[in-house]
Amino acid sequence: MKKRLLMGLLVLLSSVTNVANAALELIITDGIDSARPIAIVPFKWQGTKALPVDISSVVASDLQRSGKFSPVPTSKMPQTPYNESEINFDAWTNLGVDTLLTGSVTQNEKGEYVINYQLVDVVRGQLTSGQSRALEDGQLVLSKDHVLFNKVATITAPRMREYAHRISDLIYEQLTGERGAFLTRIAYVVVNDKDKFPYQLRVADYDGFNERLVLRSKQPLMSPAWSPDGRRLAYVSFQNGQAEIFVLNIYTGEHEKLTSFPRHNGAPRFSPDGKKLAIVLSKTGSLQIYTLDLQTRQLTQITRDRSNNTEPFWHPDGKSLIFTSDRGGKPQIYRVNLSDGSTSRLTWQGSQNLGGQITPDGRFLIMVNRSDSGFNLAKQDLETGAVQVLTKTLLDESPSIAPNGGMVIYSSIYDKKNVLSMVSIDGRFKARLPATNGRVRAPAWSPFL
């Protein structure tokens, strides 16, 4: 079945194309008053022209979106130190800040940008007046142990925003012990009825910047899903008059059709090791879940009842799948063990639960929960069963979890059209990424890149 295709009506952009002007704009809709205060001081820059990217602004925005940090507004900063030696520790601790990022940017003779930056423990710096001592070779010497890290990087202008996300990742990991997910991407489908090719598959940085068009079609595109290496996207296309599953290499443009069984082919999802796809087929009647070995093309049926079973998602250990089924009358989320086929129901609160995903640590189930207030994202503790509704947006669907489990992106309705929205895993931070030129659906968060 491995067959190279000319897409016909589906136009593949063999070299990834930048979309003119940012098509997604992140708008904060709910704050994080209880998050940890942190100071991201504007970096010093003495060049004749403006920096290509405001590094400190990108870092502050990243940390705020995580829901764990509350960056101090620049207007409320008591000073703007450009290195550790200039910090007035008392002034910052009086503001309630315990950690501060400071830095500077210069330009070398090659036109590259040299970034020096430090993350400082303000409380420890205050206690030691920035002059603590430590034993070294049996002698007390001055120590800078209040400096959590001190780094230098040389980058080009096109990489500056990317490197700002890298700084955010370093801070996040230093302060939380968890890996940051700011150097990741999202894939999504944009629908614009006025365009010659109204269905477009796009990829952007997680915050909506650097959007690129990778595929466009006159027929619907659905259900993009990333491979674990972040190089391929599985998706559903109706280019031949029915739903079929394809895989696209977003770097080379190479793609192939994987399934074209009678009736429905949908909901592809890569296994954690990237060797299989979980898919949904209706070739025997109702919707059933299968796994497809990508090397041998062996198809294995997982569910076998008369109900409709769909939206498979792999447990992080790769040994089971969760899925949505109407076997109880209305959609609820179940789990099936791939070794013996045993199945158990996971959701009990709410008249419907669907679109389930499990966080990378295996602790929580993120899902669309229907209650009297409508369809909203909810989080269920898989050990205790406790459910927390995370959103108050309208007609939520298609949740996708960041690879570190810290945030969720999803589709909702705003101003009568589909937009992407974002919520931190604890529900404290919320934002919208509305498109300026169409309806946006089916987001998929990439793995770590």
From Swiss-Prot:
Keywords: Cell cycle, Cell division, Periplasm, Signal. GO terms for biological process: cell division; protein import. SUPFAM superfamilies: TolB, N-terminal domain, Tricorn protease N-terminal domain. GO terms for cellular component: periplasmic space. Residues 1-22 form the signal peptide. It comes from the Bacteria. Its main location: periplasm. Disulfide bonds: none annotated. It is found in: Periplasm. Belongs to the TolB family. Part of the Tol-Pal system, which plays a role in outer membrane invagination during cell division and is important for maintaining outer membrane integrity. The Tol-Pal system is composed of five core proteins: the inner membrane proteins TolA, TolQ and TolR, the periplasmic protein TolB and the outer membrane protein Pal. They form a network linking the inner and outer membranes and the peptidoglycan layer. This is Tol-Pal system protein TolB. It comes from Vibrio vulnificus (strain CMCP6).
